[in-house]
Amino acid sequence: MGGKCWPGARGERWRMADAVLFEFLHTEMVAELWAPDPDPGSGGKKKSLSVLEGLGFRVGQALGERLPRETLAVREELDALKFLCKDLWAAMFQKHMDGLRTNHQGTYVLQDNSFPLLIPMGSGPQYLEEAPKFLAFTCGLLCGALHTLGFQSLVTASVASLPACKSLGVGCLLPLNVVQALGHPHLWSLISAGKGNQINKL
Amino acid sequence: MTVHNLYLFDRNGVCLHYSEWHRKKQAGIPKEEEYKLMYGMLFSIRSFVSKMSPLDMKDGFLSFQTSRYKLHYYETPTGIKVVMNTDLGVGPIRDVLHHIYSALYVEFVVKNPLCPLGQTVQSELFRSRLDSYVRSLPFFSARAG
């Protein structure tokens, strides 16, 4: 896990000293945002989720700029998704995504069978209800990285059984300028139109 | 050879976890009382052993044995105490107790954001992994004397 702490003469990349540093930091971010709200009517949980997603989005934007320096320009949706599954996931979690599927209409399902942020919680239903808040940051991360690569997206996560992150559904990837021209109502309808279709393995 | 039971205490004497496998005789007192007695005895013996030692001690108190069982003790720098009772045929198991701490307690309790530290461990994953690990040990057996 450990590695060079600075880029050397041969251009080694920066590496995180230990993945556990990020895990503990993420844990504390979630704990801080989920602290009991003195005003129960303020929509605290939804707000906390969006704050975590926002943090992830900003980190994803930065990683999107930082990581693909050695790769060619990402023009195709599939290249962008492969970048997420391999490069981004390796940078964040020292592993690759376990699966990538699509319905060829803009909806993609990314599958991680042992998502590192969920592994310590177990493999049964004990903490299943608590899982979504530990996925919000990563949803934002994917969204931010795609934004940097020029794709507008909507990312949602679901967990059917721990520690598998069953699907990180990346909905309706379009080049950024096209989406801005369409506007959000179209984006939503495109996503919902894509949901019912068969999703095939790539 | 056999494993009887295992206690996990924090630095404040809270029993974080208790498991038993081949325990034929109970103490006859409530479990909470048993934990307090065990922790108090360990606290005293550890203090006594270090004070009476004729040489500088590296690891301190490691184990004691009676005519029927052997108590193995491992303490981490953070004050977590792992205590395992076995029969007399089991040799030093410091590496086993260290594994329980580092590969099970740290991985499935400390790293689990939903397990508050300093309280009894509720994680089913920790319990099941600990049980599997202890049952896989070469000296785990029901043939207790």
From Swiss-Prot, chain B:
The keyword Cell membrane does not apply. One of its GO terms (cellular component) is cytoplasm. The keyword Iron does not apply. Part of the multisubunit transport protein particle (TRAPP) complex. The heterodimer TRAPPC6B-TRAPPC3 interacts with TRAPPC1 likely providing a core for TRAPP complex formation. This is Trafficking protein particle complex subunit 1. InterPro entries: Longin-like_dom_sf, TRAPPC. Belongs to the TRAPP small subunits family. BET5 subfamily. It is found in: Golgi apparatus, cis-Golgi network; Endoplasmic reticulum. Signal peptide: none annotated. SUPFAM superfamilies: SNARE-like.
